[in-house]
């Protein structure tokens, strides 16, 4: 969706690494967008498109299945300014789960969420640095590194602390359930 948004705004995405630094280019000249332009495009995308993001293929069905085994909470670094847009978007996509907006690394937030929690916990994220943050702050949490974005996968660093690295939503569900059965 971000690449489509950039195209509508006469830019394109040219990833050469995991980060967006220098990855947004002017479509006509191939020049790297200025930092201000890149920032404006990212924020424009967030403000205009959060409420209409599509679901990753298989995500609603997988979460529905996982809901039979666990309480699902979505911890997202979606900005507070579009929190309600994201809640509405997720509800429209049949993923009506509690959403907590976070800023920065997710390890401390997960630690706070789990403060009085005794059952097995899982953390699933596509960002390897968030997985590492949660792993370092919450050693008992099973950390899952998972992305369905083929555009980013070639540049994705290995996630420190990830004990599960599924290849699809179906694989994630299978490994999650297997992990719970092994725990009994």
Task: Label every PLM stretch briefly.
Residues 1-41:
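Active-site neighborhood of HAD-like aspartate-dependent phosphohydrolases
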Residues 32-36, 43-73, 80-87, 108-111:
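Short, acidic loop-to-helix structural element flanking the phosphoryl-transfer center
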Residues 98-104, 161-175:
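Short acidic-hydrophobic, aromatic-tinged amphipathic segments that line or gate anion-handling sites
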Residues 107-112, 152-160, 175-177:
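Short, charged, surface-exposed secondary-structure boundary motifs
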Residues 110-116, 170-183:
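Short amphipathic alpha-helix with an adjacent loop that forms part of the alpha/beta core around
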Residues 123-165:
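Acidic, Mg2+-coordinating phosphoryl-transfer loop and its flanking beta/alpha structural elements
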């Amino acid at each position: 969706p971000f690449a489509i948004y950039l195209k509508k705004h006469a830019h394109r995405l040219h990833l050469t690494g995991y980060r967006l630094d220098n990855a947004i280019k002017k479509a006509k000249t191939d020049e790297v967008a200025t930092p201000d332009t890149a920032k404006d495009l990212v924020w424009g995308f967030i403000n205009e498109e959060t409420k209409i993001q599509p679901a990753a293929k298989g995500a609603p069905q997988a979460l529905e299945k996982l809901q039979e085994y666990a309480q699902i909470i979505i911890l997202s670094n979606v900005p507070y300014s579009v929190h309600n847009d994201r809640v509405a978007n997720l509800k429209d996509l049949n993923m009506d789960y509690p959403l907590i907006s976070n800023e920065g690394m997710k390890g401390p937030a997960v630690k706070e969420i789990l403060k009085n929690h005794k059952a097995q916990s899982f953390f699933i994220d596509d960002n390897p640095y968030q997985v590492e943050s949660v792993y370092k702050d919450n050693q008992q949490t099973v950390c899952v590194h998972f992305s369905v974005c083929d555009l980013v996968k070639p540049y994705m660093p290995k996630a420190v602390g990830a004990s599960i690295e599924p290849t699809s939503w179906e694989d994630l569900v299978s490994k999650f359930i297997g992990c719970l059965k092994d725990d009994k």
